[in-house]
């Protein structure tokens, strides 16, 4: 280990930055956030330093570097574009046994600045020892995505509860299980973020008073249309906290690779007209796992509330008194159209968009007359097997046969295929495609040749 990671208490302690440019400004922000009593020395300063000085946040010393500025300092940073001056600052600090950071010169410094994830009071520092700052930054960005933004507020609140929790729970094991519940409770985190005192109190009392082996909870998470990069930040956090993940075939392998390694995985894949696991059985799986006290994620392709039967699953949980929440996802219509260069709305061509299921419950019938109207975009989910019927019905109700159409297969994935044509060709085009596919009908499809960015990558 080349460096010892430490966290310094700098509040109301003298610190010095030598340099008045953009790099020095970034370092100054960190020291000011830490509460340091800051002096900045340079021949000239960018406007931000002047603004800080006018606000009484720091002291500016304009002119050449004077070693006496270090006499009362706890810590110094050399952040000029003059290597010789930076070296001089470092040597003067070393002689006084003051830790000094030299920007972009780790060998000349007695300490280095890590990449920081600030969820105060929780702090995470990432460093490559100065050998690869870009790698440290990339790792920090990945860690940022794993730590909820409100985690710091939850940590502060936990500090206020420590005394009560110690009284309530007799053993270390009980206290540990309580804290684990508290830190993954979304309602508490959101209530703290909103400063909703009533909800904070209610949630806290519920967490403290319910048995530690209480029923679990279910989170419906939309996995998006295929590309793992389209999974939301909150969705990622949820699947990495899950004890059980119940997923279907529309969830890509790339997304499943993000699931916590020790989580149980239950595949309930479904296809139009064929259910690997009946919907009622899926409902019971969610209920059964939650009643075991587990944190269950129901992971669905697209958005769980858009043709995902999420509402049906939640009704079962609601009737059984199981807590649940929903994390929306990017629905297939949005993802597939964007990755195909087809805007769903356009001032010249479509003032509305309709999302339509391609198969209905027995006896269901669509309002084809309204669907055949101009100035709108139609998006059919699970409509591949009904493409010929869709073509026939729309033409019968007045939609022009030359209306542009497109079918998107495996939308947003690297295996995405798009085929386009006219409404009179829809049934024939569908025979060339496989599920999962999405059908888009409307004048906006005509923009695809111009706006198709994804295939060019």
UniProtKB/Swiss-Prot annotation:
S-adenosyl-L-methionine binds at residues 225, 301-303, 306, 331-332, 382, 411. The modification Phosphoserine is found at residue 128. It catalyses: uroporphyrinogen III + 2 S-adenosyl-L-methionine = precorrin-2 + 2 S-adenosyl-L-homocysteine + H(+); precorrin-2 + NAD(+) = sirohydrochlorin + NADH + 2 H(+); siroheme + 2 H(+) = sirohydrochlorin + Fe(2+). Disulfide bonds: none annotated. GO terms for molecular function: NAD binding; precorrin-2 dehydrogenase activity; protein homodimerization activity; sirohydrochlorin ferrochelatase activity; uroporphyrin-III C-methyltransferase activity. Pfam families: CysG_dimeriser (PF10414), NAD_binding_7 (PF13241), Sirohm_synth_M (PF14824), TP_methylase (PF00590). This is Siroheme synthase. It comes from Escherichia coli (strain K12). The gene is cysG.
């Amino acid at each position: 280990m080349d460096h010892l990671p430490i966290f310094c208490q700098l509040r109301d302690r003298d610190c010095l930055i030598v340099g008045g440019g953009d790099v020095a400004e970034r370092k100054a922000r960190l020291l000011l956030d830490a509460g340091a009593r800051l002096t900045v020395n340079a021949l000239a300063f960018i406007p931000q330093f002047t603004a800080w000085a006018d606000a009484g946040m720091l002291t500016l010393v304009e002119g050449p570097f004077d070693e006496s500025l270090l006499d009362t300092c706890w810590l110094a940073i050399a952040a000029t574009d003059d290597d010789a001056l930076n070296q001089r600052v470092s040597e003067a600090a070393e002689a006084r046994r003051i830790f000094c950071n030299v920007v972009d010169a780790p060998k000349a410094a007695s300490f280095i600045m890590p990449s920081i994830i600030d969820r105060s009071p929780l702090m995470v520092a990432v460093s490559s020892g100065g050998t690869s700052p870009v790698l440290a930054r990339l790792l920090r960005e990945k860690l940022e995505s794993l730590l909820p933004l409100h985690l710091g507020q939850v940590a502060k609140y936990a500090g206020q509860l420590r005394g009560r929790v110690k009284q309530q729970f007799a053993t270390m094991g009980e206290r540990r299980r309580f804290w684990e519940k508290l830190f993954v409770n979304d309602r508490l985190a959101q209530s703290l973020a909103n400063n909703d005192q009533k909800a904070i109190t209610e949630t806290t009392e519920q967490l403290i008073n319910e048995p530690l082996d209480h029923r679990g909870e279910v989170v419906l998470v939309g996995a998006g249309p295929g590309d793992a990069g389209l999974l939301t930040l909150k969705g990622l956090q949820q699947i990495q906290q899950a004890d059980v993940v119940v997923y279907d075939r529309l969830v890509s392998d790339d997304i499943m690779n993000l699931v916590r390694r020790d989580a149980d995985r239950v595949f309930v894949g479904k296809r139009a007209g064929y259910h690997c696991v009946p919907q009622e059985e899926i409902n019971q799986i969610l209920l059964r796992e939650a009643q075991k006290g587990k944190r269950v994620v129901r992971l669905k392709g697209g958005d769980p509330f858009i043709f995902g039967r999420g509402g049906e699953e939640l009704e079962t949980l609601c009737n059984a008194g199981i807590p649940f929440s929903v994390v929306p996802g990017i629905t297939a219509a949005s993802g597939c159209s964007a990755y195909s260069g087809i805007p769903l709305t356009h001032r010249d061509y479509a003032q509305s968009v309709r999302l339509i299921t391609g198969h209905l419950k027995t006896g269901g019938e669509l309002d084809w007359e309204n669907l055949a109207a101009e100035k709108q975009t139609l998006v059919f989910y699970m409509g591949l097997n009904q493409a010929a019927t869709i073509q026939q019905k729309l033409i019968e109700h007045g939609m022009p046969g030359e209306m542009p159409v497109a079918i998107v297969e495996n939308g947003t994935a690297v295996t995405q295929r798009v085929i386009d044509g006219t409404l009179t060709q829809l049934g024939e085009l569908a025979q060339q495609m496989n599920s999962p596919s999405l059908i888009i009908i409307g004048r906006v499809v005509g923009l695809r040749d111009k706006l198709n960015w994804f295939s060019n990558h």
